[in-house]
Amino acid sequence: MADFSYIVLDLEWNQPLNPDSAIREPFFFDSEIIEIGALRLDERFRETGSFKTFIRPRFYPHMNGDVVQLTKIRAQDLEKAPEFPRAYADFMEWCGEDCCLCTWGPDDI
């Protein structure tokens, strides 16, 4: 059995080019995850691993300029990236079973 670890998660999101074009049905969907980044820390908060994957956007495929400026993630970085289901499965496998997921804010939950 693997040792307990803390997983510190950071997500990056793309947004529609125009807020008026945000998906509203069947639910309000104003952004899409384009990167999962995480660090694994042991019980003494020492870094023991890292995870990073870009995610090819499905709903907002055109990069918002503000997002590019903030994250430095460009459309060409995402072209060959996995879509969310594959990236999520890879992340969950990397996390393992005995971990505590930590974030710095509500946008990463």
Regions of interest found by a model, annotated:
Residues 2-109:
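Conserved non-catalytic scaffold segment of RNase H-like nuclease domains
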